[in-house]
Swiss-Prot record:
Keywords: Endoplasmic reticulum, Golgi apparatus, Membrane, Oxidoreductase, Transmembrane, Transmembrane helix. InterPro entries: Diminuto-like, FAD-bd_PCMH, FAD-bd_PCMH-like_sf, FAD-bd_PCMH_sub2, Oxid_FAD_bind_N. It is found in: Endoplasmic reticulum membrane; Golgi apparatus membrane. Pathway: Steroid biosynthesis; cholesterol biosynthesis. Its main location: endoplasmic reticulum. Its EC number is 1.3.1.72. This is Delta(24)-sterol reductase homolog dhcr-24. It comes from Caenorhabditis elegans. The chain crosses the membrane at residues 27-47, 214-234.
Amino acid sequence: MNLVDEKDEKPTRWEKCVEFIMFHFRWVFVVPFLLPLSFLFNTVFDFRNRIVHAVNSAPNAHVRKVKHIQEQLKEWNDNGRKSKLVNARPGWLTMSFRFPLYKENATKIATDKLFDILDLDVEKMTVKAEPGVTMGQLSQYLISRGYTLPVLPELDDLTVGGLINGCGVESGSFKYGMFQHICTGYEVVMSDGELKNVYPDSAAKTEQAKQDNSLFFAIPWSQGTICFLVAATIKIIPCKKYVKLTYKKTETLSEMCEQLTEDSDRNSENVDFVEALMFNKEKGCIMLGEFSDGPDTHDEVVNPIGRWYKKWFYTHVEDLINKKHESIEYIPLRDYYHRHSKSIFWELRDIVPFGNNVLFRYLMAWMCPPKIAFLKATTPNVLRKLYDRSHVLQDMLVPLDKLEECIDLFHKEVEIYPMWLCPFYLKSQPGLMKLRNATHKMYVDVGAYGVTSKDGYHHERTTRRLESFVRSVNGFQMTYADIYMTRAEYAEMFDRTLYDWKRASCKCIDAFPDIYDKICRSGRR
């Protein structure tokens, strides 16, 4: 792997000037154009979804959409399977910061109309949804009916398909695992056009049932390189109107690690959500949530943090721990789930620097946040070069007992705060994330998002040092982010045994790109 010398990356004075203007004044375009456009898009799409639910047209439409996908694949097979298959979703709609290069010479299959909720089964306690359904859609649909997902990742625009083919972790994950672990079945279309329904049936008797069973475990994290996901059946649980959220300040790194380990007991009956934020290397806050019907007395605080005029959540947390060592609030459930959406965690502070100003919040924040897809589509190349040099967007998944070492390394290499910490339960199952030395273990997602000013930061070299540490502790790297691992290093991090077997047995090798070719940095621009 060739590394670019840092001296070759240094911009000219003119480039620095242009970058400064584009970075610090991007809001001039975002606020008057992207905010209204995002608000209009969300309003129209929400109205469309309400009509679809009212007339119950989604199930019949789903059959037609799947048939259209099968027809496209039949045509591709009849033409001799001459190119690789990819979905036709535009690159700017994906959650990755980069645009895919592997799609340029591939056959694009139109799967981009799969964005409906298909069925709610309250007897089996499942919801069936197409892969384009977002977490915002699901939370709105389910909570109004008294249900929720055990794991519902925070950002509104995250999709079912992205969380299965990629990865999903959320504050309920310490108890239920990753998003893939709450899925009970997948509906997929294979490269030959065959429609399959696959389940994790451990009691499978026939050879075909065993084949389909193994396919179920091969799909998560596979990035759509085995089949086309057209629907998923997902567990649901009953919910209450509020989350009783306890904020606990920690004053040292060791205290954070010890307390977070203690609080991440998945057998706890009084805790339903666990996450933490580090505001510098020592100061942090652990947040413990519990489903609740609301406050028992008038003295207890109800905080609807999802209202447009409310502070960005992470700033609210920091304000609280600066005043008190421990606080309790009652937050409406949907507001809690999407607590990081309004500020896109803390990325919006660089795009709209005054976005948390009280005047802006009251006058303009009802249109926030700008859609991530629109931000990505309108990022100019000159700004991408700046991001290449200084922007960090990484989620590293490491064993919880290695958290202190991991934070030490992140502080040394990138020093971006806040830092997101989300513990999750990882059980050993077949697939790319198979644990090789345990049956189950508590992990933690360490998320670093933003622009670093750390001296000596080099996008490739620094990322490779982080990747090396994660591999050394049997951790994993979320593959939406920039990945600089070699093919061999990727195979060291992820267990490709089942993946490669299903690729061969399901005739995928000539049909889909290899997963490494899709997620490596050279496959994206």
